[in-house]
Amino acid sequence: MSLLQSHLLMTLGLICLVHCENLVMMPFDHVSHVNFFVVTAHTLVKEGHSVTFVIAPRHKKTLDKHGLNYITYDSVNGDKSDDLRKAMENDVFGENKEPVSLMTTLSTIKNLVDNQKLDVLGDKGLKQQMDATEFNLAIIDGTLFCRYLYVLAYRHSIPYITLTASDDPLASGVTGLPSVQPLPAFWFTDNMSVTQRLINTFAQFMTLYVLPAVLYPNSIITEYAPNKPAVSMAFLYKQSELVLVNLQDVCLDYPRVTAPHYQMVGGMGAYPPHPLPENIESFIQGAKDGIVIMTFGSIFSKMPDRVLKKFFDAFKVFPKLRFIMRNSETTLKVPDNVLPLNWLPQNDILGHPKTILFITHGGNNGQLEAVYHGVPTLTFPLNGDQFSNAVRMRVKGFGLDLQMKTFTTESLIQNLIELTTNDTFRSKIKRCSAIVKEQMPAQEKVAHWVRHVLKYGSDHLKSHSIDMPLYQLLLLDVMCIMMLGLGIVSLLLTCCCRMVISKCCCRSGRKKIKSE
């Protein structure tokens, strides 16, 4: 080896020592969350970092496919995510038009969280592997249903960043305003009535205090991190070096109050399209009026034939359109203008110039991709934040929405006609697409902020609001003092007025007696 080559290798090694860090990623045990973290991991690998995942064994194929490192934990308590999926499918596609009760849903979720918490935090093999590896930074999914992952990072003294699709500013010490920031579970916009603001405020109080207390009692710290100081779960969440939220607040979502440590990075999975597989491309080229893509996410990859028949009957009315859909099983005869697939490259099809409409469940990632590529949507919200997502697309003029339990073939046909012939939807979402593409790409934002925190830390980004109790953050104590002051002033003025009136009455009474 020449002297020049040796010098070059030493230089590259020094650069790597300075800039390359060992990162661990902890996503929620759900396909869409793992896929989102995989996209983020590729961005960080390009930066030169080493990335390792902590995952359930069922996600190993996904990580192997992408050539990423991982540590697994044993699912000794059973994979209860199927129970949640079946409950959701029954709620959406069941014959009963009444929704599953809130208490039933919460009970299913609590069982899921309890089992996953035991699997992750109670796994001795995982603990040994984490002890044997020195991680510089953890990137943790901030979804409410997997916040036990913060205990894992805390136990092993790993600083961490939160990466989440859940906008939870108050939990991060940011002045989120329930008056203009609707909770994703509701059909509200940022322009709420008094009743809606009351409901929204109460619901945010429940998600901030009640639900976390039920899912994660503070005893979880002393049980699974006995050698660390006993702190609250709320404290652990606030200790995130940074909170990266997978939302696009420039033109898709509603403008909101943020802070330097609370950054919007919506659109990680949206990028210029790659060439499509030959079978998909040839099918698309046969479309005279364009392509419609339909998928309802990883949970609802198949639907009952009685529901699917309504879609097929509507699609037959548009012979010049072609429909690409994700649906794994059906006994129905598939129309000639429909291509069903077990899996489809959603972003790449949305980016195809012939794609004119996206029929979707309203998942956050899918909406961000639709906006990036400027494709109008027809949304069938199924659960969670999808109801709020459907509303924001409608009020911004980017699409329409229908209900899975109540839609008919006729209503679907009417919506398809409106969305494929009315250029207003396309022009509005194309404008939003242009605005989004003018911003720094989400991948670059994430890379920048991770690099920034690794180099400088995050103390300079955080406001004192993080350490303030909620009543101080919302100035409730100041308002109480002001109301008390106003009350005292009002009382004094009332007393003074009574005294003046009383004296005046006394004087007039004396004069009257003298005159008599």
Regions found by a protein language model. Name each.
Residues V338-L339, T377, V395-M404:
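A short acidic/histidine/glycine-rich donor-binding loop in glycosyltransferase catalytic cores
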Residues S2-C20:
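Cleavable N-terminal signal peptides of Sec/SRP-targeted secreted and luminal proteins
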Residues D29, V45-K320, L332-D336, W343, ...:
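Nucleotide-sugar-dependent glycosyltransferase catalytic domains
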Residues I140, N342-A390:
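A donor-sugar binding/catalytic signature common to diverse glycosyltransferases
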